[in-house]
Amino acid sequence: MSAVRPLLLLLLPLCPGPGPGHGSEAKVVRSCAETRQVLGARGYSLNLIPPSLISGEHLQICPQEYTCCSSETEQKLIRDAEVTFRGLVEDSGSFLIHTLAARHRKFNEFFREMLSISQHSLAQLFSHSYGRLYSQHAVIFNSLFSGLRDYYEKSGEGLDDTLADFWAQLLERAFPLLHPQYSFPPDFLLCLTRLTSTADGSLQPFGDSPRRLRLQITRALVAARALVQGLETGRNVVSEALKVPMLEGCRQALMRLIGCPLCRGVPSLMPCRGFCLNVAHGCLSSRGLEPEWGGYLDGLLLLAEKLQGPFSFELAAESIGVKISEGLMHLQENSVKVSAKVFQECGTPHPVQSRNRRAPAPREETSRSWRSSAEEERPTTAAGTNLHRLVWELRERLSRVRGFWAGLPVTVCGDSRMAADLSQEAAPCWTGVGRGRYMSPVVVGSLNEQLHNPELDTSSPDVPTRRRRLHLRAATARMKAAALGQDLDMHDADEDASGSGGGQQYADDWKAGAAPVVPPARPPRPPRPPRRDGLGVRGGSGSARYNQGRSRNLGSSVGLHAPRVFILLPSALTLLGLR
């Protein structure tokens, strides 16, 4: 027995012992066959992958233990890990980008088509009512709609000037036609324009129609423009956030997560879910848009509700022709009072010789009656879209993406390439250094909370992310201001269009049945000399119209240099004895 004992002591080290426990280091794997099979399927050259483990002293990111990776293989795996992660993020965000882009396109097409429908409807109404009188001078109305389109599509400025110039053009043609027996030199028309621009508003030739039209059009266009711009800004910000280059710390963490198991020779060992969540939260913290994202979505929904309610774009577009006609009727019905005040302030013009008086309009054009807009069919877009449906679709789509940024790490780690399945959470997994269980806490939340992330350093400032959040915050502020009737893009915001609430101040303009609250009077506009176009103005050579003390860009002045025209009401022709 004593002779056998030394022999047993020599054979004991060769006997297999118990394997490592669930919480121990990875099992010793001497073969790289599994790694060669996986990387060979990806197109890696097998000449770069040894058949068995080699010393890992050359590794820069993975544990410097026995490895299946050369330095070149490790660098390629770093790039592959980044591509995989980036692809998952962009695929997850593709629905969000598509949602914002599609809503932007639909709302933009709707608003533009509603303006076209309004212009076409006005042309049909006025052509039916006034015939050749309208067709000869339709350019003034085309100029009005050109100015409205320029504000919505291009400049974002000059809306007040566009509307005020339209009414001024109309007045400079209307007053001489009400008194064809007189000659009106440029100085007289300049005095007339000055009277209508006084702060006390004592002379309102078109009654309250200019103010009411201005309120409806301004609020609706400001809200529509802010909504479309907000959708476009959101789309651009999200698209940029999903495609920004990754920081070096994120690239290294991703390599430890899904690349190092291949180098260790255990590609089938899935990363621990907590490990993946920490890496994903750390990498995405510099891309996420919280908390600005929630406020941005609230701003979109608030403004969309206002556009189908108190700031109805459909109602504002439909009311253009109605408000203009009401203004002309007011001028006709109060012509005696208006003329008396004008003659008192500006003097009595010289009479025109009878042979120089304008010929009356044809009888058939003056006998047509005005037809109220209530008799017209409600306009719809070519696709049959209405604002109510667009807002419902927007609300439904945005409800799906409200928690997008907060849930993006969970979505990414739900992919089978990134982490173990939830059903295998109790099984050993890849911890970053070997087989075991991931014991570090999962850090979620804001960028400040990510400072405690155990997997990567997020303390370095991220200027691009801050810039994107500022863009989103600015778009939100613009939309919330537009929901209050304010245009932040206008340097000289007008009190009539600003309001202090959600539009209830001017409920009479929105068919709400409440009495209007008259806003403060506008400051006086600079006087305008009359234009020289030879239409209905006698006794003066005229002068070019100018805009004193006002600045505007090209987009807001497109429709402001058209010849002035006037649509004479049939009943007014009758009263003037021209039939």
From Swiss-Prot:
Keywords per UniProt: Cell membrane, Glycoprotein, GPI-anchor, Heparan sulfate, Lipoprotein, Membrane, Proteoglycan, Secreted, Signal
Organism superkingdom: Eukaryota
Pro-peptide positions on chain: 557-579
Tissue specificity annotation: Nervous system.
Signal peptide: 1-21
Glycosites: S55, S92, S155, S498, S500
Region (Disordered): 347-382, 483-552
Cellular component GO terms, alphabetical: cell surface; endoplasmic reticulum; extracellular region; plasma membrane; side of membrane; synapse
Short name of any one Pfam family annotated for the protein: Glypican
Membrane topology type: Lipid-anchor; GPI-anchor
Major localization listed first in the record, in broad terms: membrane
Record's compositionally biased regions (Basic and acidic residues): 361-379
Protein location: Cell membrane
Record-level GO BP terms: cell migration; neuron differentiation; positive regulation of neuron projection development; regulation of protein localization to membrane; regulation of signal transduction; smoothened signaling pathway
GPI-anchor amidated serine lipid sites: S556
Comp. bias regions, Pro residues: 517-527
Protein family according to the UniProt entry: Belongs to the glypican family.
Quaternary structure, from the entry: Interacts (via heparan sulfate) with PTN; this interaction promotes neurite outgrowth through binding of PTN with chondroitin sulfate of proteoglycans, thereby releasing PTPRS of chondroitin sulfate proteoglycans (CSPGs) and leading to binding with heparan sulfate of GPC2. Interacts (heparan sulfate chain) with MDK; this interaction is inhibited by heparin followed by chondroitin sulfate E; this interaction induces GPC2 clustering through heparan sulfate chain; this interaction induces neuronal cell adhesion and neurite outgrowth.
Known function: Cell surface proteoglycan that bears heparan sulfate. May fulfill a function related to the motile behaviors of developing neurons.
Protein name as annotated: Glypican-2
Protein's organism: Rattus norvegicus
Primary gene name: Gpc2
